[in-house]
Amino acid sequence: SFGGQANISKYRNMINVKEIRLIPGNHDDRLVSLIKTDPLVRSSFILCRDINMIKCHGCIFILSHMPVRDDIVDKLLSGRNIDNTPVILINGHLHGSKYPDNGFKRYFRVDASIETNNYLPYNILDIIKLYNESEYI
């Protein structure tokens, strides 16, 4: 993920945030292993589950590496009182490729792979603006 263990601290120190929550992807096996075994690397990241749900700025965000199918989202939201709360799915993995045709249509989604935003991180407020400008409103 970082071009080798020696680069982890260098790149981590370039990211100006207090915490980095890592949702592991298919290229992160070595990094996950280091987080579990190396105290210095462990202090740089918070290792998260494959699918994470947070509420922020009045929206529900479902964060994952792989895109999450609609039926799985339905199960995640089942029994929750969300009323008309916007639900926004953010994933990586696709690197700008299209979402599959089946099972990925009912929720607003953002492929947050770095290739989709000029190799810059997305701002959560920009994602909410995209949602507000979409047909999912």
Show which residues each predicted segment covers.
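Conserved beta-sheet core of the metallophosphoesterase superfamily
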Residues: R21, P39-I137
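Core catalytic region of metal-dependent phosphoesterases/phosphodiesterases
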Residues: S1-C56
